[in-house]
């Protein structure tokens, strides 16, 4: 089976939660929960509130996201 296409969006980290989870406000105003992708975790990339991030959303659950890129 091929992987489903993901929806990429921009957002801003609002709050840090336990277990490397973050509350993210997307460009369209929705608030989602996001976790760090494996490559970012391996390279010890730190994410702080106020950082702009790129997230991947799956069409199955639009309330959870995977953080794939961080900009300042």
Swiss-Prot record:
Component of the 30S ribosomal translation pre-initiation complex which assembles on the 30S ribosome in the order IF-2 and IF-3, IF-1 and N-formylmethionyl-tRNA(fMet); mRNA recruitment can occur at any time during PIC assembly. GO terms for cellular component: cytosol. It comes from the Bacteria. InterPro entries: NA-bd_OB-fold, RNA-binding_domain_S1_IF1, S1_domain, TIF_IF1. Residues 1-72 form the S1-like domain. One of the essential components for the initiation of protein synthesis. Stabilizes the binding of IF-2 and IF-3 on the 30S subunit to which N-formylmethionyl-tRNA(fMet) subsequently binds. Helps modulate mRNA selection, yielding the 30S pre-initiation complex (PIC). Upon addition of the 50S ribosomal subunit IF-1, IF-2 and IF-3 are released leaving the mature 70S translation initiation complex. The keyword rRNA-binding applies. Keywords: Cytoplasm, Initiation factor, Protein biosynthesis, RNA-binding, rRNA-binding. It is found in: Cytoplasm. Pfam families: eIF-1a. Belongs to the IF-1 family. This is Translation initiation factor IF-1. GO terms for molecular function: ribosome binding; rRNA binding; translation initiation factor activity.
């Amino acid at each position: 089976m091929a992987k489903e296409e993901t929806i990429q969006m921009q957002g801003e980290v609002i709050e840090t939660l336990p277990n490397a989870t973050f509350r993210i406000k997307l460009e369209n105003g929705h608030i989602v929960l996001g976790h760090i992708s494996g490559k970012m975790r391996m390279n010890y990339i730190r994410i702080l509130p106020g950082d702009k991030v790129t997230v991947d959303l799956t069409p199955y659950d639009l309330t959870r996201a995977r953080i794939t890129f961080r900009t300042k």
